[in-house]
Regions:
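Short secondary-structure transition/capping motifs
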Residues: 55-62, 95-99, 144
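Active-site region of glycoside hydrolase catalytic domains
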Residues: 2-50, 93-95, 103-466
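Catalytic domains of carbohydrate-active enzymes, especially glycoside hydrolases
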Residues: 65-86, 291-296, 359
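Glycine-rich, proline-tolerant flexible connector loops at the mouths of alpha/beta enzymes
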Residues: 85-98
């Protein structure tokens, strides 16, 4: 007997869309006035590190094709869309002169999105620092904080008549981990002291942007986007539970608590103090963080954080790394995306929703990224279309968990998939495809995948049957 399908209907006004970023989609055109970013510089000196040596200069050519791409937003059922302004495009040197071509470009993009009846969210920073500032120490240098504050104010002044919903930073912990505790973001060094200072300076910059936004546009909403992941211990043994708690302090609460609550977790401060890793800060700066919390929260969720107690302690003279507090745990029998290697754990989204409800005042939030990267997706091409049923299933199964959380009072207002059109993903370039729309790298032709048409039906009916 065929099992009857269940209807998952979402609240009226629930928003459906996707997220992308400037550096991953726009590309560079000769004469566009864009300055080099940290990624442009890194690619120029070490292109072999990038998959198939594809760098940030071409990406998905949104700069040239934005009108057609925005029409595709409508065709795939978007009611909300998040993109980012590239700081080095708008202010090529990071400070000083504004690039008028960038102003024209972004105003036209924003106007076209709004004209389609799509709610627009604009992010100010998606890992792309003007290289001129990186040369002077980047986020280790407080001067970058003040430069970012000026950049944010410039954006609010130039585009505030079009944009009323803003993001300060996307996943700010990622450059900290990958650039200062690893080798996946420039400047590629392992320096715990620098990592902590970069994290603190980024949070201060975010709080200053919130302050500036509220002063210039009191009716606007501003947020930060965090890759929030609950930490799951290997076992209930005290040492594993402690490792999970510390992992969550570093990976999530280091930005979540100051952004939403205005304070740093006492245990995190204590750990940093004990390790002689406290950043340079002032009482006035802590007041800025305390008094300028976000209006809502953006949540990115891909996979769970599974950890276990550390197997080794720090030896004298060794650089301090997070492995002395917790180690990754590879859980046997987990469900895995075979095309990407990441664990798929849909209840993680439900756990995040309940955490926000119970510990963060049930703050309003959006899922700002959730998606499935697939290597070699052309293997699923049939009848001129990528038959990505696996992506549809991935989205459905996460939405079931979100629907459950909404039924229990979670304050989530929308779901934004990563991503719209297959985009450039940093060192991985185009290795893994995430889009509702396929991109042919040779011709730059866009073709809606099966999931794109399914997503439109999801949006139009505000729910699905499964």
């Amino acid at each position: 007997m065929k099992q009857r399908k269940h209807r998952y209907q979402f609240p009226d006004g629930f928003l459906w869309g996707s997220s992308t970023s400037g550096p991953q989609s726009e590309g560079t055109v000769p004469g566009d006035g864009k300055g080099p970013s940290n990624w442009d510089y890194w690619f120029s000196i070490e292109s072999a590190k990038f998959h198939h040596q594809i760098g940030p200069e071409k990406t998905s050519t949104f700069y040239e094709n934005y009108k057609g791409d925005i029409a595709l937003l409508k065709e795939t059922g978007h009611t909300i869309f998040r993109t980012s302004i590239q700081w080095p495009r708008l202010i090529p040197e990071g400070v000083g002169e504004v690039n008028p071509k960038a102003v024209t470009f972004y105003r036209e993009v924003f106007q076209d999105i709004i004209a389609q009846g799509i709610k627009l969210i604009v992010n100010l920073y998606h890992f792309d620092l003007p290289y001129a500032l990186q040369e002077k120490g980047g986020w280790e240098n407080k001067a970058t904080v003040w430069a970012y504050e000026t950049y944010a104010k410039t954006c609010f002044e130039l585009f505030g008549d079009l944009v009323n919903t803003w993001i300060t930073f996307n996943e700010p912990i990622v450059p900290v981990e990958c650039g200062y505790l690893g080798y996946y973001h420039y400047p590629c060094k392992v320096d715990a002291k620098a990592a902590v200072q970069v994290a603190y300076n980024t949070q201060l910059a975010s709080s200053l942007a919130v302050k500036a936004c509220h002063k210039l546009h009191p009716d606007h909403k501003i947020s930060i986007v965090l890759n929030m992941t609950s930490a799951y211990p290997r076992s209930n043994a005290p040492e594993d539970v402690k490792a999970a708690r510390i992992a969550e302090l570093f990976q999530t609460k280091s930005f979540l608590d100051p952004s939403v609550l205005g304070i740093y977790p006492a245990e995190l401060v204590s750990i940093l103090e004990e390790a002689d890793l406290l950043p340079q800060y002032s009482a006035d700066e802590l007041e800025i963080i305390k008094n300028n919390t976000v209006d809502f929260l953006g949540v990115n969720y891909y996979q769970p954080l599974r950890v276990q107690a550390p197997s080794k302690s720090q030896q004298e003279g060794d650089p301090l790394i997070l492995d002395i507090y917790f180690e990754p745990y590879d859980m046997p029998g987990k469900k895995v995306n075979p095309h990407r290697g990441w664990e798929i754990y849909e209840p993680g989204l439900y756990d995040i929703a309940l955490n926000l409800k119970e510990h963060y005042g049930n703050i309003e939030w959006l899922v700002t990224e959730n998606g499935m990267g697939v290597k070699g997706e052309e293997a699923f091409l049939a009848d001129g279309q990528i038959q990505d049923d696996y992506r549809i299933t991935f989205i459905e199964d996460h939405l079931i968990q979100l629907h459950k959380a909404l039924g229990e009072g979670a304050n989530c207002k929308g779901y934004l998939l990563w991503t719209f059109i297959d985009c450039w993903s940093w060192l991985n370039a185009y290795k893994n495809r995430y889009g509702l729309v396929a991109l042919d790298l040779e011709s730059q032709k866009r073709t809606i995948k099966k999931s794109g048409y399914w997503f439109k039906a999801l949006s139009e009916s505000n729910g699905f049957d499964k």
